[in-house]
């Protein structure tokens, strides 16, 4: 029974993967950046994490750069460099020292997360 369940699970993961984009070294680097800077302490990713800052599981779709790796990097880089914005009455994102390679990885990680089939979860399209 154990062997049969193991084979079934392996086939399901291989054939029914929810990822719409390959898991590249850049995506892995981006996940490491996400974890190192504890982004989930403020943001949610597919509904998991804190609710202080916007959901980022669909941020690349909202920004219109899901299929544009260079555009995703450029908009994320500009956004992160503009923080904190200093807008009165608004929550402030801290400024992070992130290399260009790490920023590209983070952009790829967020594009990868955005292409994951979450079966419409979370149900909110907004961030």
Language-model features, listed with the residues they occupy:
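Extracytoplasmic electron-transfer domains, predominantly the class I c-type cytochrome c fold
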Residues: 24-25, 32, 46-50, 58-120
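Post-cleavage N-terminal segment of exported redox proteins
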Residues: 1-25, 79, 109-127
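Short cysteine clusters
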Residues: 39-42
């Amino acid at each position: 029974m154990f062997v049969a369940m193991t084979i079934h699970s392996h086939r399901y993961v291989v054939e029914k993967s929810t990822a719409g984009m390959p898991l590249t070294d850049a995506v892995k680097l981006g996940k490491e950046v996400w974890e190192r800077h504890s982004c989930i302490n403020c943001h949610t990713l597919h509904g998991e994490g804190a609710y202080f800052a916007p959901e980022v599981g669909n941020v690349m779709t909202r920004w219109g750069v899901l299929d544009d790796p260079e555009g995703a990097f450029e908009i994320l880089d500009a956004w992160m460099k503009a923080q904190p914005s200093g807008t009165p009455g608004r929550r402030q994102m801290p400024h992070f020292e992130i290399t260009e390679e790490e920023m590209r990885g983070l952009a790829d990680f967020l594009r990868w997360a955005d292409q994951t089939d979450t079966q419409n979860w979370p149900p909110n399209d907004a961030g």
